[in-house]
Amino acid sequence: MEAKDIILKAIQHRTSENPISNVELAQLCRSYGFNLSTERVREEIRLMRKDGVLILSQASAGGGYYMSRSMDDYLRFRNTNLLPRVIDMQDTMKLMDYAAKREYKMDAQARLF
């Protein structure tokens, strides 16, 4: 059993009304002999999400991680958590591309692709 298995098993029993924090997950992993920091817990969750595991989160007080139970759960998370980050990063990239083009007086577009 790996640390990610412990994390996933703990999250699978959680809902949006009863999420588990990364601190609790790190403590749980330690109880099984895995010395994971909260940052490493977040990384394990990020990797599981990339594998298609529908782990959701809420950042509010008392927040934490939980499993998606429906398409509505997933879409709410996607639209309030993921999408704003993607849009912000895309906006930042466009502004930096424009600034680089001005700064270096060249067509940045040609060099970016």
Regions found by a protein language model. Give the residues of each.
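Positively charged, polyanion-binding regions of nucleic-acid-associated proteins
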Residues: 1-17
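Short acidic, hydrophobic short linear motifs in intrinsically disordered regions
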Residues: 17-28
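Short helix-coil junctions and helix-kink-helix linkers
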Residues: 26-38
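Short amphipathic alpha-helical interaction segments
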Residues: 35-50
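A short, conserved structural fragment
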Residues: 49-59
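Minor-groove-contacting beta-hairpin "wing" of winged helix-turn-helix DNA-binding domains
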Residues: 60-69
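Short, amphipathic alpha-helical interaction segments positioned at domain boundaries
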Residues: 72-95
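Exposed, interaction-prone assembly regions rather than primary DNA-binding/catalytic cores
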Residues: 89-113
